[in-house]
Structures are given as structure tokens and as C-alpha cells.
Amino acid sequence: MDASCLFKALLATNWALFLWDQYITFRQYKAHKNAVKRPNEVKELIGEEDYKKARDYKIDNHLFGFFHSWFNQLLLTAQLIGGYYPFLWYATASYPLHVAVFLSINSIIETIIDLPWDLYSTFIIEDAHGFNKQTIGFYFVDKIKKMLVGFALTMPIVYGIEWIIVNGGPYFFVYIWLFVSVVVLLLMTIYPTFIAPLFDKYFPLPDGDLKTKIEQLAASLSYPLTELYVVNGSKRSAHSNAYMYGFWKNKRIVLYDTLLSGAEKEKVHELYVAAGEKIEETENDKKRGMNNDEVVAVLGHELGHWALWHTLINLVITEVNLFFSFAVFGYFYKWEALYQGFGYHDTPPVIGMMLIFQFVLALYNQLASIGMVIHSRSAEFGADEFAANLGHGENLIGALTKLGVDNLSMPINDSLYSWCTHTHPPVVERVAAVRAFQAKNK
């Protein structure tokens, strides 16, 4: 295949995948648009007022998403046809640290182009629906900080990969895979301790009923919990979350303050005020959050992922995917027609990696993503069942219901869209599965 035909074929594939994404997203939009009345099957999960709020939020995000995605797709097409990337690559060729200069300038340009969209999403949509907690000053400081940290982390990795390509011999892709795998594990280890605190303040969860119950849950499962933190997620957004991290005998749990309610939230906020943090809560914010038993049920679900080896399985799947992707890169990275089709007159490895990962592997990435969604949904049901088996079924149902309401999750979904994109099954399906498990084990 000559260079011109190859370029057209890869661009056509890119457009086909984009249109597929637009098709299933439009199906989801129509499902939400047409669901004006609250269906009977979700009435016990969400009230009439909350249902209307969730529907309005989703429709606003859908409409914004359509315009944003079409803008990005048309911009990318114009950049590819117009030769923007080759122009920037060769225009920066005379600078020391060519790759770093190219990637940095491109990243800054992309950030500036996307800035109006991100500002609209944050300060118009999220703000209108009660989620945004950022000031404009905090927003820009946070974005600049993230960009600088991203540069500091990315550039050594890129240069390490480039050095391996040049010096690694015929099996360089194996060494790249090993190098990237080690870097990923290292970042997973150091990120929560050294990088995340650059953006948010983490405090030990105050002593009390919640801490005692979480420690008892961890001990009952022989989970090697060493630290239990709470983070002030409410300074950015009202969305709630919790996660675990760590290796071997050094496991830690982090709760967002938005997950908590009542006295537990008040104790946490007292910590933040004492540390100089500003806490502002609306009446809606005060209504959000879970009771202690529901938080414990959520962590029972998260510990289910650990006990059922889901974390390790996901890591193995990620490693297999990385190895395959780098093997494909190793096979195609000197394919001159690929570079020529996109406007390059030599074969720079960094450009080759960008082209192969974004365009040559595009269809594979789409199929792999759907496969991971299917696997993830199965794991979520398994973790829910694990928590229910511990006796937290009813509290888990309460927690899932509150998570859905607090985050304005729409309980109605298009089946195809959900099957292709929802790594976590809809709340309706999860609640039904927990109840079916409870009925089976009475």
C-alpha cells in the first residue's frame, strides 16, 4: 500500500470509530431525552425531583459532549490533512532536546485550544448543577501545576523509551515493555505519597465509629491496612469517591470527604479548617453523603476486588496489552510509508509511536476497550456479591442509591451504550443483582 492510500485508510478508520462512538452516544442521549417520566422500576431508587435533576444534568453533558467531540474530530482531521504535526516537528528540530520541545509546545497548544471547552464544562455545566467548587484562580493554578508535573514525569520516560529503541537491538520492544512496566509500578507506588499531596491535602481519618468499623472490616479479611486517609475532594467538586492503593503488606485507603455525612464529615472539616483550608457547603452539599455503615459497605465492595484478585488480574491484562502494543510498534516503526503518508520525510521513533498507537492500533484499542468494559462489569458484580456475603447487602444498596443520587447518575440507560462503555453497571442492575443474591442465600 502506498503512503497516500495508507493515510486515507487510517484516517477513514479513525472516522469510522468516531462515528460509531457518536452513534452509541446519540442512542444514550435519546434514551435520556425520551425518559421524561420516572419509570416505575426506579422509583424506589430516586425521587421525582432528583430524577429531573439527573436527567437535566445528563442532557446538558450530552449536548456539550456532541459539540466538543465534533470540534476535536474536525480539528484533528484538519491538522492531519494540513500537515500541522510534521510542521511543528521540523520547526523545532534545531532546538536542544528536540522531543521535549516538540511535545511541550504541542501540549501547550492543545491545552489552550481546549481551554474554553474545559472552562465551560467546569464553570457553566458543573456549576449550574451544584458540583463545581473551584474558583477561577484555583482552577488555573491547579491546571498549571498539573501540566508542570506531567512534563516532569513524561519527559524522562519518553527519552528512556527513545534510548532503548536506538540501543536495544532487535528485541528492543521487550525492553521497552519491561521499562514501562517498572515505571508504571513505581508511579503507582509513589503517586499517592509524593505526587497527589501536591494537589490535595490528606489527613488521617479521625478516631471514631467509622474508623473503628473500617479497621474491624480490614482485620476480618486479613487486609494489611496501614493507613486510612481522608482527602478534601470538596474543594474541587461535589462528586464522591473512595479508593485503595499499595502493595504487599502496605495497604492504604483514601476516602473523599464528600462520601461522608453528619458527625464524621464535621470532624474531617474541622481538620481542614485547622490546616487553613476553606470549607464552603451549600444546603445540597449537607444533604449528600452516606452514613457510617454505608461507607463500610462501599469499602467491603472495594476489598472484594482485592480478595477476589481483581486488581492483580487487571494488572496482568494491562501488561499483556502493553506487550502486544509494543510488539506491534516494534514491527511497524520503520514502515516508511506510514511516516510519508502523514507528511514526515524520515522515521523518528517518537512520531512512529504516536502514529502506531493512535492510528494503526485504533481498531484493536476500541475492541480491547469493550473487552475491558465487559470484564470490569463482571468484576463489579463480583465485588458487590462479596460485600453482600459479608452481611453488608442492605447497606450497599443504600450506598449505591445515594451515590447515584448524589452524583446525578441517570438510572435509565441505552443497553448498547451501557454494554460498550459502562465499566460499572448501572445502579438499577447492581441493586437487582444484590437483591437476587440475598434472596438466593436466605
UniProtKB/Swiss-Prot annotation:
Keyword Repeat carried by entry: no
TM spans (from-to): 63-83, 85-105, 147-167, 171-191, 312-332, 350-370
Cofactor note: Binds 1 zinc ion per subunit.
Membrane topology term: Multi-pass membrane protein
CDD domains: M48A_Zmpste24p_like (cd07343)
Cofactor (UniProt): Zn(2+)
Reaction equation(s) it catalyzes: Hydrolyzes the peptide bond -P2-(S-farnesyl or geranylgeranyl)C-P1'-P2'-P3'-COOH where P1' and P2' are amino acids with aliphatic side chains and P3' is any C-terminal residue
GO cellular-component term (any): membrane
Pfam families per record: Peptidase_M48, Peptidase_M48_N
Enzyme Commission number(s) from the entry: 3.4.24.84
Active site: 302, 384
Location in or out of the cell: Endoplasmic reticulum membrane; Membrane
Domain of life of the source: Eukaryota
Transmembrane in keyword set: yes
GO molecular-function terms, A-Z: metal ion binding; metalloendopeptidase activity
Segments on the Cytoplasmic side according to the record's topology features: 84, 168-170, 333-349
GO BP of this protein: CAAX-box protein processing
Function, as annotated: Proteolytically removes the C-terminal three residues of farnesylated proteins.
Family of this protein: Belongs to the peptidase M48A family.
The protein, known as: CAAX prenyl protease 1 homolog
Organism field: Caenorhabditis elegans
